Amino acid sequence: MEAGIVSCLKDCYPTFALGQITAGEEVAPDCVIYVEDDSGKKCVEAMLHHYRRQADPLVAQPTIATVPLGGFSQILEFVDKTPQLLPATTTIRMMLDEDVRLESLADYEARQDHYMLALFNRLNGQIRYFPWTPETGLMDLLRANSATHENGLKRYFNDQRVSWPASWPPAEVPGTQAQRRRQAKRDMSTLTDHLQALIGRSNDRVREGLFDYLVQQSAMNPALNILGLISQTIH
């Protein structure tokens, strides 16, 4: 009600309505997104930020909580066994790294791991996948055109001191996909420490910026459909 006039708001999200009724009483979010780790959390939050910049500012958006829970199997078992922790009005989603879809599921099928296959099948409607594994996606992006992305990060951080470490980017080390992921984590850690020393921002803020840059660049590739992915996740 405003100025004595009562108006109806159609199709609003539950927490918007409850917030008006409870006048500040804490309520559950409209959507909870479980991710594997802090890297996944930073990527989801960057995707949400990008989505909200594109959304109609006059349309109410859902409240979102992004929660790191550990390995993907722990996430699946947690969601499967504890659905009662959140009210029915809260949408539960899982955003898993690309390697789960490409490697882990194939491995379960090859080994006929019926328990894990049944778990994936039960929760399939709630599972979404990043178009990359965060650290690997970032390193692949930077390695593909290092000069362009060095300049891109100068603009992103608004700091001309941004530059690559010596002998950067490192050559991709041949090996298994698991070895590539571990190497990507080490390479990103080296880059993060280097940029932290150069521009004087916290390690966490630099990591957040690098993943936000990854999401921004990925959103420019229609094949990755970043906006569609996050929209389908939260609605």
Language-model features: locations:
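Short secondary-structure junctions and interdomain/linker hinges
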Residues: 85-86, 149, 160, 164, ...
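Activity-critical C-terminal alpha-helical subdomain
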Residues: 95-193
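Terminal low-complexity/disordered tails
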Residues: 177-235
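Short acidic-hydrophobic, aromatic-tinged amphipathic segments that line or gate anion-handling sites
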Residues: 66-70, 128-131, 200, 210
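Short, structured coil/loop segments at alpha-helix boundaries
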Residues: 37, 52-59, 97-117, 216-227
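Generic hydrophobic, helix-prone segments enriched in Leu/Val/Ile
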Residues: 2-12, 127, 138-143, 227-233
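RecA-like P-loop NTPase motor core
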Residues: 2-102
